[in-house]
Amino acid sequence: MKISLPAFEKAKVLVVGDVMLDRYWAGPTARISPEAPVPVVKVEQLEDRPGGAANVAINIATLGGSASLAGIVGVDETADALTVGVRALGVEPNWHKVADKPTITKLRVMSRNQQLLRLDFEESYSQAESDALLAQSLSELDKVDVAVLSDYAKGALISPQSFIEAANAKGVKVLVDPKGSDFSKYRGAYLLTPNMSEFEVVVGKVESEADLVAKAQGLLQAFDLTAMLVTRSEKGMTLITKDQPELHIPTVAREVYDVTGAGDTVISALATAIAAGSDLPQACAIANTAAGIVVAKLGTSTVTRLELIEALSLSHGESGFGAVSEDQLAYALEQAKLRGERVVMTNGCFDILHAGHVSYLQQARALGDRLIVAVNTDASVKRLKGEGRPVNSEDRRMTVLAALASVDWVVPFSEDTPQRIISRLLPDLLVKGGDYKVEDIAGGSEVMAAGGQVKVLGFEDGISTTAIIQNIMANQ
């Protein structure tokens, strides 16, 4: 499956559920305690990270989406730390505060990148506290396209049926990261994302692929669900829907380092992609790629859009530079822009590459960090130049251009002008050689409307492809 990332910045997602603080104490271990046969950790590093539903929200924000967050917290230092943590990552929380219970905290003691001990500080929330959280979250449904219920069975989502019904009435898709043996509480949701262990708690032991699909279909019918994505560790993911064949997506993890928060990453990537307009198979493939990235990190972590783009480029077998397709270039260009690189673009036939071309391309490249050369296809050159042109096929022209040190990407276009492809790629600077006026350069108005610049560069006098061809013909 060819995966295309949507415009994540269009995604508006509400996250409701069990929020918690993941706290890490880390340091070296060099001796055993004289008090008991346990290692002594000399703590040198303290770190707090938002976890649970809070991690889902910041994953959405890190991808570029807009996330609102609702959860239950105590009136304590941990709640303050959690608030600071989510705000620092672009998420504004809407807490339901309870005075007699602590904010859920998971304290991990780490040494040499290994977890030695985990301490949990928590008390389950009551039905009344859960109902209050869900009720205060209803007003947010008018502002979003997707809602996520992140259930860690801590009590924030005891009975979410009325919330799901309200979301459905407003056309908001509800995605659930479920917990527990009773999936009936999620009746009417759009999608559930259980892992294999959670799935088997509900349906019993899965004996085969066919058995998995059949049991998932049974849950879809029983609880009026649209789809289910079962995450299966090293076996990847399986998407089951009511009206389509199952879709198996193989794992893309390069190395499993820590699975903490992997489920949060899956549902956050799913929600962001769906809210941004991806169809369900595409969204699942994006989530699978994101999960493969996050399990290679230590602790509760997030995935950036740039990491996704780079991972997708590798999975598509793309080197990132040279002669590329338009879609490949769109990926590469987004990486460059996220790195803060200034991208220059030019275009032409470049039929017989000569010293004038080389000098011009060197000038263009000197104006930025990366240079795109859009090249007319053979059919386009023939329409513009007439019979007998091009002398060199587009493959050969692109190969020669891509070999120049000044050129980063070469991409073909089939139209008579490059206006469409320039309008799609929108470089920071569009350059054209010759005696053009800026206002007459194809694609120039679109580049300037997007905040870019347009510049005319001079060619070396007396050097042209036409003159070279005429000289060859005269000497035959």
Swiss-Prot record:
It comes from the Bacteria. Keywords: ATP-binding, Carbohydrate metabolism, Kinase, Multifunctional enzyme, Nucleotide-binding, Nucleotidyltransferase, Transferase. The active site is at 264. GO terms for molecular function: ATP binding; heptose 7-phosphate kinase activity; heptose-1-phosphate adenylyltransferase activity; phosphotransferase activity, alcohol group as acceptor. Its EC number is 2.7.1.167, 2.7.7.70. Pathway: Nucleotide-sugar biosynthesis; ADP-L-glycero-beta-D-manno-heptose biosynthesis; ADP-L-glycero-beta-D-manno-heptose from D-glycero-beta-D-manno-heptose 7-phosphate: step 1/4; Nucleotide-sugar biosynthesis; ADP-L-glycero-beta-D-manno-heptose biosynthesis; ADP-L-glycero-beta-D-manno-heptose from D-glycero-beta-D-manno-heptose 7-phosphate: step 3/4. It catalyses: D-glycero-beta-D-manno-heptose 7-phosphate + ATP = D-glycero-beta-D-manno-heptose 1,7-bisphosphate + ADP + H(+); D-glycero-beta-D-manno-heptose 1-phosphate + ATP + H(+) = ADP-D-glycero-beta-D-manno-heptose + diphosphate. ATP binds at residues 195-198. CDD domains: RfaE_like (cd01172). GO terms for biological process: ADP-L-glycero-beta-D-manno-heptose biosynthetic process. It holds the Pfam family CTP_transf_like. Residues 1-319 are annotated as: Ribokinase. Disulfide bonds: none annotated. Residues 345-476 are annotated as: Cytidylyltransferase. GO terms for cellular component: cytosol. In the N-terminal section; belongs to the carbohydrate kinase PfkB family. In the C-terminal section; belongs to the cytidylyltransferase family. Catalyzes the ADP transfer from ATP to D-glycero-beta-D-manno-heptose 1-phosphate, yielding ADP-D-glycero-beta-D-manno-heptose. Homodimer. This is Bifunctional protein HldE. It comes from Shewanella pealeana (strain ATCC 700345 / ANG-SQ1). The gene is hldE.
